[in-house]
Amino acid sequence: PGQFLTLMFKQLTDQGLHFQQASVIGLSRHKSGIEATLSGGNRVSAKQVIIAAGAYSRDLARMAGDRIPLQAERGYHLEFDLDQPLLSRPVSASSRGFYMTPMQGRLRVAGTVELGGLNPKASRHRLYKLQQGTNYYFPHLKQANRSWLGFRPSIPDSRPVISASKYGNDIVYAFGHGHIGMTLAPITAELVYALLTSTTPPIDLNDYSAGRF
């Protein structure tokens, strides 16, 4: 995924994308469009805004006027550096609740579900369980070279929010895809485009509306 995203980012910047990394601490509507207040005091204006910040989208949606029961579902990762690959494809250790995925020069082990909010502190016992499960299949592997946790954006009914805000399509939502955000990214982009341009989407979006809660 890293190489793909790097290439996609380069393609977009070559086409004129302006990238700015900052925290959004406020959203306000004006006759000319939406104004976002960024950390540091800078302000950015746009006619339309897409909120697609994954597990961090709930507070942004609230600024836009919608209360959406988005929760952060914490998932854990280990990586083992390898001279030779151990697997030729992703493998699910379903009885132990994790996946093993071959990467360039390494094996990534990821899984578990923990409803622990956006707290960045890892639960060490979950990392231990992943290490223990990996060693069940590959006893020769030593301690993982890297570990981290990530936040999956989860919605109680397991459907993402792909919707205009309740005040109009000047703000459009695209989040809550759980474990399959990259998988659903292409069709989500097509649906978001339809919402932004007020054209007919390829599927009925009522089940994905922010107003269903």
Regions found by a protein language model. Give the residues of each.
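Helical element adjacent to the flavin cofactor pocket in flavoenzyme catalytic cores
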Residues: 1-40, 44-47
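Alpha-helix N-cap/helix-start capping motif
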Residues: 2, 54-55, 186
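Helix-loop-beta segment of a Rossmann-like dinucleotide-binding subdomain
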Residues: 1-10, 112-115, 169, 175-177
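Beta-strand segments within the central parallel beta-sheet cores of soluble alpha/beta enzyme folds
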Residues: 21-24, 144, 204-210
